[in-house]
Amino acid sequence: HKMDPDVILQGAIFEIITTDVNNVPIPASVFEEFDLMPGNRNFNYKKMIYPFGRRVNHWHKDASVPDMSRTETKMWFFYVAKRWIDMGLEAIHFGQVEIMDDRDRNHIHWRDVMARIRSYAKKHARRSIVLCDAHVPSGGIVHDGKLMFDLHSFPSRPKSLKGQPHKAILEKGFSDSIYGRSAGGVTPSGWSCESLPYIVEIDNFGNSDHAG
């Protein structure tokens, strides 16, 4: 920011939770945000995962998809977002939201935690705002005409060209690409659009396991 004060730095809170969270103390401010009595304890991995084994160990052993309907998960997301904002970051990517909402289909809990994060940013962020985005294979999350995110994001989904090695195109309708599918509505900032602007990621997955 000293070199370029207009730069927006982005952090992320992804669709993964590991047992490492058991080593992170919960600050009193996080308890208080959720109207809970502050206590001397760490975050609890088992209180964040889906019950009945759903999406548990989804990524690898002791690395699961968090369940946003659980208070502990909401506390974790608020805690990480707060740390990003306190560090001067002004944008947060929330990963694959639509695999963290299996028990929150109306996104009541997602909207609640997003509202808490935005409220904190309004008081503490560099420019009193945080821009939030996520991967949205559905095209976007909209309730009562209101978009949940400031922008959408998705992998670019390049389509290989038969007989033309090393060449690819970005094609509307190919695979689950977002082109032409980004939902519109009223943004968190209050302006309206027919299709929310989005980011496409050139390299979302790293190197291929079947190069060539």
Where are these regions (language model features)?
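Glycan-processing catalytic domains of CAZymes
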Residues: 1-212
